[in-house]
Regions:
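Short, low-complexity, Pro/Ser/Thr/Gly-rich segments in the mature regions of secreted, periplasmic
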Residues: 166-181
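Short, solvent-exposed beta-strand/turn "edge" segments of beta-rich domains on protein surfaces
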Residues: 48-66, 77-79, 122-126
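C-terminal motif of bacterial Sec signal peptides marking the signal peptidase cleavage site
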Residues: 17-20
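Bacterial signal peptide processing site
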Residues: 22-24
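The feature marks short-to-medium sequence segments in extracytoplasmic or secretory-pathway proteins
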Residues: 72-129, 155-157, 171-175
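Solvent-exposed, conformationally flexible loop/turn segments
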Residues: 28, 32, 126-130
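Positively charged n-region of N-terminal signal peptides that target proteins for export
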Residues: 1-12
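Short, surface-exposed ligand- or partner-binding patches at beta-edge/loop junctions that are enriched
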Residues: 131-164
């Protein structure tokens, strides 16, 4: 997290005008909608549930959610993307969320992708670069309706953190587990 905040520090100087204007709202979309954040655009192209992803299997009572996304850097300089930018949620419970399996959330260390189309935990994006790939989450069985959320985060010159808009993309994942969810 600290590395992420440092990476955004330079961008935050330019973002001060935005945070001074309020921010803190939310936007929502559906599969195929392009969400336009301060730093990048992203689209959830499709999503499905599976019991196996490139040899990776979930723990008992869980399935894997595979979301195909496209990200485009629309900022005026290169940025570093993190898989933890994209949180998946399945209901309103306090613990009803997960981060991609490419980050160990107990140690905050990056884990190697297991699939060839899977986005890594961290990756650079040049100005106007666009990248598509899969985010893989371990989620409880029995759910097919999800949202992927992104929260804009800024750091000013003094190290003060603030947040901007939150973006939600709602979708129903196709069940490919072989069992009804």
């Amino acid at each position: 997290m600290k590395q992420r905040l440092l990476a955004l520090a330079m961008a935050a100087v330019m973002a001060m005008g935005l945070t001074a204007c309020g921010g803190g709202g939310s936007s929502e979309g559906r599969t195929g909608d392009t969400m336009e954040t301060y730093f990048f655009d992203f689209t959830v192209n499709s999503a499905y549930l599976t019991s196996d992803y490139a040899g990776r299997t979930p723990g008992e009572g869980n399935v894997l959610l595979v979301a195909d996304i496209t990200v485009k850097n629309t900022f005026e300089q290169s940025i570093e993307m993190y898989d933890t930018d994209f949180q998946v949620q399945w209901d309103d419970g306090d613990d009803a969320y997960a981060y991609p399996i490419t980050t160990d959330m107990e140690t905050y260390t990056e884990v190697e992708p297991v699939g060839e189309n899977q986005l890594p935990g961290t990756y650079p994006m040049a100005v106007d670069e666009e990248r598509s790939g899969e985010l893989v989450y371990e989620v409880p069985s029995g759910f097919t309706d999800f949202s992927i959320a992104y929260l804009e985060q800024f750091v000013d010159d003094s190290g003060e953190e603030s947040t901007g808009e939150t973006f939600f993309v709602y979708f129903t994942a196709e069940d490919q587990t072989g069992a009804s969810a």
